[in-house]
Amino acid sequence: MEYSFSDEQEQFRAVVQRFMRDKSPMTEVRRLMTTKDGFDRDLWMQSCDDLGLAGLHVPEAYGGSGFGFVEVGIVAEEMGRSLLCSPYLGSSILATSVILHAGSEEQKRDLLPDLIAGKTVACLAFAEASGHWNSDGVELTALQSGKDVLLNGKKKFVLDGCAAD
């Protein structure tokens, strides 16, 4: 089976590649690796504004572009090529996907716009200290407190957890 990208996807790749090349020189990557967040929030918001990176796979009904995971993969490939420091995988792909698939309509309307705009960084915490991946090993507890839910426990390997809002 042979696969090739459409002309539109190749044009998108070229735009993303140019942005990454211009905005992510190796000296900047090294500098950002020593910062608290590990990425430049202003540059992240610019990538969301100019290229719509954070909302690529989010349906248009929620403010996204409505593209698929092929376009997400194009961005990931170009980010890997340039080593752009960003919360793309943790916030824009993992967290938004969980919200899209498990969130209520109210949660989607409330949470997705700021994630898509790059104003908010989210993370997904699912790995248990035990290393088990099934529901039997979950040690986290949730307690309803009025309208809020209080979470208690520990998670490991939380991608972008240090920068999440």
Enumerate the language-model features and the residues they cover.
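Amphipathic, small/basic residue-rich leader segments at the start of a protein or domain
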Residues: 1-89, 110, 114
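Conserved beta-strand segments that form the floor/walls of ligand-binding pockets within enzyme
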Residues: 4, 57, 94, 125, ...
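Short alpha-helical functional segments enriched in proximate histidine and acidic residues
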Residues: 19-23, 98, 122-123
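Glycine-rich, Trp-frequent "lid" loop and neighboring beta-strands that shape
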Residues: 65, 106-165
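Short, conserved acidic/polar surface loops in the N-terminal third of protein domains
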Residues: 67-68, 97-100, 135-136
